[in-house]
UniProtKB/Swiss-Prot annotation:
Keywords: Amino-acid biosynthesis, Arginine biosynthesis, Mitochondrion, Transferase, Transit peptide
Cellular compartment(s): Mitochondrion matrix
Subunit structure: Homotrimer.
Protein name: Ornithine carbamoyltransferase, mitochondrial
Family the UniProt entry places it in: Belongs to the aspartate/ornithine carbamoyltransferase superfamily. OTCase family.
Length: 370
């Protein structure tokens, strides 16, 4: 009878499954040149409109409108047909949402993919494991991560370590998908058909008046406007102005632009709306600011957008109104919100087309925006 086969002693299970090379690669304290974050094959992410050239931003807006027209007419563009077939997109939302979730999940489905929603009860960034570990593991199993988080540092860390594209669906500093939808809405309403260079969307010289809190939606809107040659006047109560570091980012967004949009700030709503084509506001109390609600409501008294404010301040005769939603009555009067000047509901719908355009550019086309 032959003797039993003898095998060489095996290393401990932990060492076998975690060899030195992998320990170096996935260490949370040391990242060599071989890590996904610094690899020459690292994906391109959309964290802010500041990440885009003027031409790229205008292209995303134009593609959103083009896909909207085609799909609504019953013709799915060839570039989108089954573009995400067999692919999973992780929807990592640590903040609740209505429009963002419906629009991004709907966009993935329209393109043939599978959206996997991971809410705050499913995954808590940086709580049970490091953001590094989460980014590496999740990105190894999906085609893209769409992240709606609290802090910009969280989505930036996800992108730094993800091997797949990360699209920022909102953080405390930026909201790029909203900016694409906003400029799609403005372009569809104001731009002369077939006129204007690609970089400008035909909107050069337009003026936006923002009346309310200086927040993430405003920041990406102002960055976009600077790139597109659109002027922005911001009216906030004292103490609620755009932070200095964000002003520097907005200023830098105009570099290389022939006629960048101008940004001015005031504490007087009437001064901001003078000569404005579009009046915009947003919530005065964002998620996470609930304890400040009473003080904020007092501080923002007099900043409600009304027809009387527009008339008193001298907005242009054909002015229009926008709001990213959800809306509260203290921010804008019913007469404006539900009136003929409101672009609010087309703006909300355009979130779907903006998401489709972004997924096409950053996931399907690997960051090549064309």
């Amino acid at each position: 009878m032959p003797s039993p086969l003898r095998t060489a002693p095996q290393p401990p299970l932990r060492a076998f499954h975690n060899p030195p090379a992998l320990r170096r690669l996935y260490s949370s304290t040391s990242h060599s040149a071989a890590t996904p974050a610094t690899s020459p094959f690292a994906p391109r992410h959309l964290l802010s409109i500041a990440d885009l050239t003027p031409t790229e931003f205008a292209t995303l807006v134009r593609n959103a409108s083009s896909h909207k027209r085609a799909i609504k007419s019953g013709s799915i563009p060839q570039s989108l047909h089954g573009a995400l077939s067999g692919k999973t997109v992780a929807m990592m939302f640590s903040k609740r949402s209505t429009r963002t979730r419906i629009s991004t999940e709907g966009a993935v489905v329209q393109m043939g993919g599978h959206p996997m929603f991971l809410g705050k009860d499913d995954i808590q960034l940086g709580v049970n494991e490091s953001l590094y570990d989460t980014a590496v593991v999740v990105s190894s199993m999906v085609e893209c991560i769409v992240a709606r988080v609290g802090k910009h540092a969280d989505v930036a860390d996800l992108a730094k370590h993800s091997t797949k594209p990360v699209i920022n669906a909102l953080c405390d500093s930026y909201h790029p998908l909203q900016a694409i939808a906003d400029f799609q809405t403005i372009s569809e309403h104001f731009a002369a058909s077939g006129k204007g260079k690609l970089e400008g969307l035909g909107l050069n010289g337009l003026k936006i008046a923002w009346v309310g809190d200086a927040n993430n939606v405003l920041f990406d809107m102002a960055i976009s406007a600077r790139k597109m040659g659109v002027d922005v006047a911001v009216a906030t109560p004292k103490g609620y102005e755009i932070p200095k570091e964000m002003l520097e980012i907005i200023e830098k967004a105009g570099e290389g632009v022939k006629s960048p949009g101008k940004l001015v700030q005031t504490n007087v709503p009437e001064e901001a709306v003078k000569g404005a084509d579009v009046l915009v506001t947003d919530t005065w109390v964002s998620m996470g600011q609930e304890e400040e609600a009473a003080k904020r409501l007092r501080d923002f008294a007099g900043f409600q957008i009304t027809s009387e404010l527009a008339k008193r301040g001298g907005a242009k005769e054909g002015w229009r109104f926008m709001h990213c939603l959800p809306r509260h009555p203290e921010e804008v009067a019913d007469e404006v919100f539900y009136g003929h000047r409101s672009l609010v509901f087309p703006e909300a719908e355009n979130r779907l087309w903006a998401a489709i355009s972004a997924l096409e550019g950053f996931v399907v086309n690997k960051g090549k925006i064309e």
